[in-house]
Amino acid sequence: TFLHFSEGLVHIVYIDYLKLAASYENNCAVDEITDDKLESMFDKLEEQYGGYCFDEDYEKKVFSTWSVNDFFQSVVSNKFVYFGEYWYDNGGVPKILSDFVKNNEQELFDCILKGKFISVPTSDLKFPPSLISINPKVLMCQTGYLTLCSNLKYFEMLLGIPNGEIYKALNRL
């Protein structure tokens, strides 16, 4: 199961860690962190580890729990800000991912380098068959390498790369 944090939850649960990261990023004390500096750090966090959408209406985006936790753990232990590829580094390159990249190279290339989206029938997302016959694009969405980029009201869904962490990971393949 893919767990996630909402924007509000990150602001509430991780506020002290956000302030600490912002203080390292700005070379100042935690009590000198302004709202602007705090929001700037949050925006960077969101760009790297947020952007996942599993909402039929394409309204709510969430963060990768694994990556957010590892990011803040790194900030505390290393005393500097480093936006690593925590989720990807934990899982390695599963065969299913390397097969997907090999079989969808041009479409994925267009998504990575040209900012285009990957199209998939809505019915494939709403009613995925067994793991053996699932549309590989849907599986990549379910495993977090792609995310919803449009609502489910049409016959085709658009999928895209959720964030900087996954963008960098896909570029490494």
Segments and roles (model prediction):
Residues 1-173:
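Phosphate-binding site recognition
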